[in-house]
Design a protein with these regions (language model features):
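Metal-cofactor-binding active-site regions of metalloenzymes
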Residues: 1-195
Length: 195
């Protein structure tokens, strides 16, 4: 959402996804934010600054340095402002992550094993890379998918669907109950299973 605010206000991409220093990127966001009044991002940002950092001002280009310094100081010294602390203070009960079918879900396993974590973190199955045969890297991805299910290669459509089914089952064991799809287009052509 922050990137959208920045892009819609003409901020050069090098300050959004580029390699400019974090402080400069924050400055550009702060300068763009006042143009988002009425957009939830404007209100969320200022509400978060108030609730978590005790800042009663409004973030803009003129206050960016003050906010940057305040937030960085509090993040370094306030034990309530750890990732877990922020999640717990926000009364978050469930976090869904977006995960690729070949992911090992290592951190999901670690979180599940930690009895001190009181909220649920579950993976979501996002098989985009297994869908579009025209995307660069598709063949390499299929080789990785084959390897993760213990196969040398996936030589037929049934092999691919079986591999994806195995990964869905693994994800389900790890708490997955949702999938997430980012399709560039929806290919459709009537075909029989044999075709």
């Amino acid at each position: 959402y922050k990137w959208r605010v920045m892009r819609s206000n003409g901020v050069p991409e090098e300050y959004i996804t580029g390699d400019k220093p974090d402080r400069e990127r924050f400055q550009k966001f702060a300068e763009a934010l006042p143009m988002a009044i009425g957009n939830p991002m404007y209100h969320w940002t200022n509400l978060e600054l108030h609730v978590f950092f005790g800042y009663d001002g409004v973030l803009n280009g003129d206050t960016a340095e003050e906010v940057w310094n305040l937030c960085n100081d509090k993040l370094q010294h306030d034990p309530k402002l750890t990732v877990r602390g922020l999640i717990e203070q926000s009364n978050v009960a469930f976090i869904g992550t977006t995960d690729d079918p070949i992911d090992d879900l290592y951190w999901h396993k670690k979180i599940k094993e930690d009895s001190t974590i009181k909220f649920t973190v579950a993976p979501s199955f996002r098989p985009d890379k297994a869908i579009n045969i025209n995307k660069p890297g598709f063949a390499e991805y299929m080789a990785k998918l084959a390897a993760v299910v213990g196969k040398e290669k996936l030589a037929c459509i049934d092999c691919v669907t079986d591999a994806l089914t195995k990964r869905i089952e693994f994800f389900a064991e790890m708490g997955c109950r949702a999938s997430d799809h980012g399709l560039d287009y929806v290919p459709y052509r009537e075909a029989t299973k044999d075709e």
